[in-house]
């Protein structure tokens, strides 16, 4: 197996020490292969870089127990995000060795494992428990108990419960109450999509949902004073994070709130690891970034992932400049960090529609350089491995499409364009500038063709 990689994250052995160790990592293809001590079967852990059909074929052999990392797979089924129960039923139903148990908080007690699990499992069964309940406190306590339960191998959390409680709510509550579990392969991984952000208080869900124990590097976003260490068993010790959440105040003169947000943003920069974004398109509004990025990602197919930057009008509302306060800029910057972390989990070429360069430029535009150094430091941390920057010039002789949010004023557009020039060329950024985007006389289609040739 030439794709086998060195272990980075060791999860607790299968129940009762059956000899079936689970290794979690995020390189491509095979993560770990181990022969079962009792029956000689092989256990394979696959990364999500394989398609569903390939995975089903790998399940065909009776001599191989195959487990599929769901962190990316959940985005692939019919273009939707299925529940954990659907995931297990669809993929693992042909494995009698793997059993799913839906457990309500009212059912889970000291005797649940000893009696119920024995009915579900034989000695070599891999049990996945999916908790349900109406109370965040009860769910949090049950998840913590399951983590210590020797009979439970994997804990699965659906994205959303019938009563409206989301996986992000549960994760946030587990962290807040000290019940976060670190010893098992807990499939809670998932970064909130932009349409899940209804208001600024939802940032708590973004920040605390990016705690990733499916990867080698558990990521803590927005935490203060947390250090990650490993013990002798190569398990990450459970930290005691104190989360300071970024707020977007209605009172823009609230200096204490803005000061706290600046501190949280700086702490965030120090707490998370760099992403793997490769190409970022930057530039003023209405210059063809999104159109170009989407088409390029489509042409590159499975070799690329397109990540859209959170709407820039969250940072710079041209129709009401007073809304463009620093607190909102910091909030949007954290969303971008989430995109970088998401990109890190795929290991493919990533096309970014905007990046932190845009944050720097718009912070200058709105705040006269106030706290711009925060975004500059964040850029060094998160964008240091971007290999190419495409700076989009205003399109020649074309009107800017008005979507009700972007600027259509050529004068303001050119003012921002000049700020990009100042930021890109008066800085120490060591970046490859893509000629496809540097020619304002080219149409979008011509830019795409030239862009593809340049990469």
Q: Which positions does each model-derived feature cover?
A:
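P-loop (Walker A) phosphate-binding loop of NTP-binding proteins
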Residues: 284
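Alpha/beta catalytic cores of nucleotide-metabolism and tRNA/nucleoside-modifying enzymes
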Residues: 1-31, 89, 148, 175-186, ...
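Glycine-rich phosphate-binding loop used to anchor ATP phosphates in small-molecule kinases
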Residues: 328-384
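A glycine- and Lys/Arg-enriched "phosphate-lid" helix/loop adjacent to the NTP-binding pocket
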Residues: 366-422, 429-432, 436-442
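Non-catalytic, usually N-terminal nucleic-acid engagement modules in DNA/RNA processing proteins
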Residues: 1-122, 226, 273
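Conserved substrate/cofactor phosphate-moiety recognition/catalytic segment
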Residues: 294, 298-338
